[in-house]
Amino acid sequence: MSSEKSGLPDSVPHTSPPPYNAPQPPAEPPIPPPQTAPSSHHHHHHHYHQSGTATLPRLGAGGLASAAAGAQRGPSSSATLPRPPHHAPPGPAAGAPPPGCATLPRMPPDPYLQETRFEGPLPPPPPAAAAPPPPAPAPTAQAPGFVVPTHAGAVGTLPLGGYVAPGYPLQLQPCTAYVPVYPVGTPYASGTPGGPGVTSTLPPPPQGPGLALLEPRRPPHDYMPIAVLTTICCFWPTGIIAIFKAVQVRTALARGDLVSAEIASREARNFSFISLAVGIAAMVLCTILTVVIIIAAQHHENYWDP
């Protein structure tokens, strides 16, 4: 009892104030004793239970000096508390405190670094970021395909996959379709060589909106008959000019000049119509004058009668 109550030797004078009136600095944690290796049948539990005692420094009049002195003197000058058994071995361990002492459970140095061994397979790793799909392998051999005839003398290979194999480009040419045109009533003979031919008459094929048959250009009209008629019956000055233009139309057609023939044809038509109009107007005017003269003559005769 005397060793537990004494904090410092009697020779050291007490210079500190009462221990319960002034705050004391935090005491340094005691150095944990070396831990023993756990047995093989206890590998599922934490490795912090060991035999030994927890030494608590007594806060007496000496403060930290009494704690250091108590740590040097060992169990005789420190308060030891019994530790509750936690998977303790069946027999008393070496250095265990006496049964009458109270021990506190010792915590590991770092509670976040506890070594715990788990049985079973490891958890799967987190899924990695979605990687782009690997590029398709380049074809090394020509894929089987079929031959598409596109033009006379040039063919192209179109594979089944829809792409053209390297070295064999697909040669496409614009479509040149020739539609046969048969005139109405034109018979044609059909049959095998050496056999009798069958003569039949087919109607002309219908013309679609995008199909136009090239017809030969019609030559322009010379208007010679109307020019002669207007010259004789209507107005001869313009009639003679119309006849002259009609002759120019025939001359241009004879040498193959369609442009000059078109121009001369228009002029011959215009002068012929002018001759016709002047002739009609002259006949109307002559008729009116004739009627006026006849009426005037009758009035004059009636005036001079007795």
From Swiss-Prot:
Its main location: membrane. Residues 1-144 are annotated as: Disordered. GO terms for molecular function: signaling receptor regulator activity. Pfam families: CD225. Residues 276-296 dip into the membrane without crossing it. Residues 245-275, 297-306 are extracellular. Expressed in the brain (at protein level). In brain, expressed in the neocortex and enriched in the hippocampus but only modestly expressed in the cerebellum. Expressed throughout the hippocampus but is most highly expressed in the CA1 region and the stratum lacunosum-moleculare of the CA2 region. The chain crosses the membrane at residues 224-244. It comes from the Eukaryota. InterPro entries: CD225/Dispanin, CD225/Dispanin_fam. Residues 40-49 have a biased composition (Basic residues). One of its GO terms (biological process) is synapse organization. Residues 15-36, 87-111, 121-138 have a biased composition (Pro residues). It is a single-pass type II membrane protein. GO terms for cellular component: glutamatergic synapse; membrane; postsynaptic density membrane; postsynaptic membrane; synaptic vesicle membrane. Belongs to the CD225/Dispanin family. This is Proline-rich transmembrane protein 1.
